[in-house]
Amino acid sequence: FEQANRDGHRISGWWTIESSRAAVDDSPQIIALNHSQFQANNFMGQTALVARCIEGETALVFVQDDFLMNDYQRNSFEMTLRIDDEPSQQARWNSLTTNKGAGLFGPEAETFIRSIYDAERLFLRLVESNGQQHDAQFDLAGSQDAIEAVAGACGWTTLSLSTDDYRAIQTLLNAGGFDVGTPDGQWGPASQTAMRAYQVSVGLPETGAPDRATLEKLGVN
């Protein structure tokens, strides 16, 4: 945390939040790192949970301190996940090119990140192809700030919204003079552009997404 503070990164609970711009297109980038499994005497590497937005793609990555043997036919790892006191669930996460972890990318990452927004802890078990297990339980204190930063940079909302919800938001934007076209419940480029214009008008970050702060400003509960 001392190094993160010196580097000017935000700190929220167990998370450090680094902001930058992509070299290829100047799009906003966020790397949020959960340090709750940090061990000062581990010189081989650290176990960490990383939520990030890089060049418009969201990822959630479980980083391990060992080199791992994945399922080469599926290029993935068997995972056991448990959020707070909920029943555990089985999943498969993609292997990393570094061979030191596994992750979810794109819409899969967005969906899972939404599911831990209000959680206090996350247990992960990664199983190598040889059966060796790697367990970690992360304290998620401060995760809402980290998740909102990642979602804002990649232009998605941390809320689980239905088609009817999106249609209602589009109707509100049209009524306020921010044209989305015919409200259809699909959050496409026209809706994103209209939302950005509204966000600028009320002094909010231009995410283009119906995020929590924007919906509160719109009067949507």
Residue ranges and their predicted role:
Residues 161-164, 174-221:
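Short acidic, glycine/serine/threonine-rich helix-capping segments at coil-helix boundaries
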Residues 1-176, 192:
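A generic "folded-domain core" signal
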